[in-house]
């Protein structure tokens, strides 16, 4: 199903009973009950934005680049099909992303400004990050220098430490989920797997190449999985490929559990001995 642009969605919004920051009548898992909050005027409205281009498509939605008509600010508008979200059982992931982003505020994390929904679509107005994905730069360059890898790693560490201070585990660190702003600094995005966590959880989620052994073995996992994923990311940034890869996920899992690393020759001594940081 094709997601509507802001112009079409604005018509639906003007006909709705009430426009608040979050509507609450379509899926309890995604929205709090009306009694849990007091109505308040929205900071943004769909009809106040012009759609410029579709920046990306996913399994149940699209991301549009939009511009606010009066202030001329640019935003990324994430439009998700509610029936597709429910059919693919992604309600919890959408809820996780929204609740986490509403709680956090950090220069290396994507910002969420506003959410709204009408009968068939859910909207998330987010910060526009013009530099694109770290993944694209890594594939174009092949691999990064130790200096570049150290720069990105330091900023990612700051972001992860902040999330952990809020008792939030990110659980989906990978090059595709790291955006670069106009000055080259990182922004973590896609918080669908993020979770508020005091102790441990047993959910199997994430990208196969980046899963920690305790996740694969269903032993319960906590914050340490983010640091494991950072190690995998550092290896991939400096070598051009992840340390454990195979044609199928089960082969990847076996190699992760075996724990054997093979370093490319071009990696310097400090990287191989873990003294890079």
Curated annotation (Swiss-Prot):
InterPro entries for this protein: Kinase-like_dom_sf (IPR011009), Prot_kinase_dom (IPR000719), Ser/Thr_kinase_AS (IPR008271)
The family this protein is said to belong to: Belongs to the protein kinase superfamily. AGC Ser/Thr protein kinase family. cAMP subfamily.
One cellular-component annotation, GO: cytosol
One GO process term, biological-process aspect: protein phosphorylation
Signal peptide: none
GO molecular function: ATP binding; cAMP-dependent protein kinase activity; protein serine kinase activity; protein serine/threonine kinase activity
Coiled coil: none
Listed PANTHER family: CAMP-DEPENDENT PROTEIN KINASE CATALYTIC SUBUNIT PRKX-RELATED, CYCLIC NUCLEOTIDE-DEPENDENT PROTEIN KINASE
EC number(s) recorded for this UniProt protein: 2.7.11.1
Catalytic activity: L-seryl-[protein] + ATP = O-phospho-L-seryl-[protein] + ADP + H(+); L-threonyl-[protein] + ATP = O-phospho-L-threonyl-[protein] + ADP + H(+)
Residues at the catalytic site: 172 (proton acceptor)
Domain Protein kinase: 49-277
Residue spans of biased composition, Low complexity class: 1-12
Protein name according to UniProt: Putative serine/threonine-protein kinase PRKY
Source domain of life: Eukaryota
Ranges where the record places region Disordered: 1-40
Keywords, sorted A to Z: ATP-binding, Chromosomal rearrangement, Kinase, Nucleotide-binding, Phosphoprotein, Serine/threonine-protein kinase, Transferase
Positions of modified residues (Phosphothreonine): 203
UniProt-listed SMART domains: S_TKc
PROSITE patterns per UniProt: PROTEIN_KINASE_DOM (PS50011), PROTEIN_KINASE_ST (PS00108)
Tissue: Ubiquitous.
